[in-house]
Amino acid sequence: MAPQLLLCLILTFLWSLPEAESNVFLKSKVANRFLQRTKRANSLVEEFKSGNIERECIEERCSKEEAREVFEDDEKTETFWNVYVDGDQCSSNPCHYRGICKDGIGSYTCTCLSGYEGKNCERVLYKSCRVDNGNCWHFCKSVQNDIQCSCAEGYLLGEDGHSCVAGGNFSCGRNIKTRNKREASLPDFVQSHNATLLKKSDNPSPDIRIVNGMDCKLGECPWQAALVDDKKGVFCGGTILSPIYVLTAAHCINETETISVVVGEIDRSRAETGPLLSVDKVYVHKKFVPPKKSQEFYEKFDLVSYDYDIAIIQMKTPIQFSENVVPACLPTADFANQVLMKQDFGIVSGFGGIFERGPNSKTLKVLKVPYVDRHTCMLSSNFPITPTMFCAGYDTLPQDACQGDSGGPHITAYRDTHFITGIVSWGEGCARKGRYGIYTKLSKFIPWIKRIMRQKLPSTESSTGRL
């Protein structure tokens, strides 16, 4: 019986082999349900490590939340995600005129520089000198629908068509000396606690002044000239325009019989003062009416007094330029009116009185004074402010020019170049509350100045003329 049972079991086994073989491999549809690739689980160490962008989002597809865990910063996550999803839309640099591109999902955004607009910053909003000076470093001129930049004498127009590059070591308007961080910078001049305010006078002073300024460092005011005579020493200031021309106030010319010029000095008390430079000729504006120094003048102070207060001194021999002796740049009238005089501050300097009716300073003083709008200027003065004048100074701070500073420079800096914008002319006392310094408005006289500077080289004879 046993052999028969064994045979039966063998036959049953052999009969079942084909069915078993057919079930060893599952159909693909069924197999895929079991053989799907699952995301690799982080190990315990990985869970405590900071995110890794290569592991999370490059080796494997990640979600925005996972990317956020890596960067731990919303802005960085957004920047990465916009590129990760559909590539960098900014790779082709679609933004014109140096616009800044920001990638998005299926799009991008251009942030345009001032003066441009459009999806790609392709539209130019301005080609006008009245908007940011046309982006010109010095002078701007409107030409049809475009602008044209040019530079002050001694400068070359840069390859970008906007910047100005100094053509020499002593190009105009460049001061070599700058204040370090431990020194007060010109914009940070503050009120002196021991300011002396003397008895006020109702008379205008033709000899304006610098009160509570700071010592001008060597090379910081290189365009400063001082007018001196044999008896009074420094009696007025001036501005170097070129090797042979110095700008000053017309009323300074009548102060003395003899005039010499000193340049490059900051301390008159030192024994080794600079040489006295001889004057060849003086040009006084023909419309200037010298004030009568009498009580009758001070009571009336008629309209023409101190109007056209400008003169040019021609030297016998050229001024030698150096790091401490450099001319100020002469602006165009439009540039002075539309750009320079719309700045916050101008810079005045001189050897004038340290307080009202006080002695002149032995050291060159410098002060930054804010421009004052014309309406406020006219309301503040007891005397006429003509179109050839402008105001600058402080309403309440005791800082101003003073006696002996007349004829000196009012300078305005623009893009690190210093331009002459005015001449110290007159004022009602020194640093009085509610009173400002009055300056000759240089933009009114650019053609007159250029006409004189086109004159021939100095002759050997001295003379005084009116033009």
Swiss-Prot record:
UniProt-annotated glycosylation sites, renumbered to this chain: S92, N254
Organs and tissues of expression: Expressed by the venom gland.
Active site: residue positions: H251 (charge relay system), D309 (charge relay system), S406 (charge relay system)
A GO BP annotation: proteolysis
CDD domains in UniProt: EGF_CA (cd00054), Tryp_SPc (cd00190)
Pfam families: EGF (PF00008), FXa_inhibition (PF14670), Gla (PF00594), Trypsin (PF00089)
Segment forming the signal sequence: 1-22
Keyword annotations: Blood coagulation cascade activating toxin, Calcium, Cleavage on pair of basic residues, Disulfide bond, EGF-like domain, Gamma-carboxyglutamic acid, Glycoprotein, Hemostasis impairing toxin, Hydrolase, Pharmaceutical, Protease, Prothrombin activator, Repeat, Secreted, Serine protease, Signal, Toxin
PTM statement from Swiss-Prot or TrEMBL: Gamma-carboxyglutamate residues are formed by vitamin K dependent carboxylation. These residues are essential for the binding of calcium.
4-carboxyglutamate modifications at: E46, E47, E54, E56, E59, E60, E65, E66, E69, E72
Propeptide segments, given as residue ranges: 23-40, 182-209
Disulfide-bond pairs as recorded: C57-C62, C90-C101, C95-C110, C112-C121, C129-C140, C136-C149, C151-C164, C172-C329, C216-C221, C236-C252, C377-C391, C402-C430
Residues marked Not modified (site): E75, D103
Site (Cleavage): R209, I210
EC number per UniProt: 3.4.21.6
Catalysed reactions listed for this entry: Selective cleavage of Arg-|-Thr and then Arg-|-Ile bonds in prothrombin to form thrombin
Complex formation: Heterodimer of a light and a heavy chains; disulfide-linked. Is associated with pseutarin-C non-catalytic subunit (AC Q7SZN0) in a non-covalent manner.
Miscellaneous section: Is classified in the group C of snake venom prothrombin activators, since it does not require the mammalian factor Va for the cleavage of prothrombin as the venom contains its own non-catalytic factor Va-like molecule. In contrast to blood coagulation factors that circulate as inactive zymogen in plasma, venom prothrombin activators are always found in the active form in the venom. Hence, catalytic and non-catalytic subunits are found naturally in venom as stable complexes.
PANTHER family for the chain: COAGULATION FACTOR, COAGULATION FACTOR X
Record's protein name: Venom prothrombin activator pseutarin-C catalytic subunit
Source organism of the structure: Pseudonaja textilis
Phylogenetic classification of the source organism: Eukaryota, Metazoa, Chordata, Craniata, Vertebrata
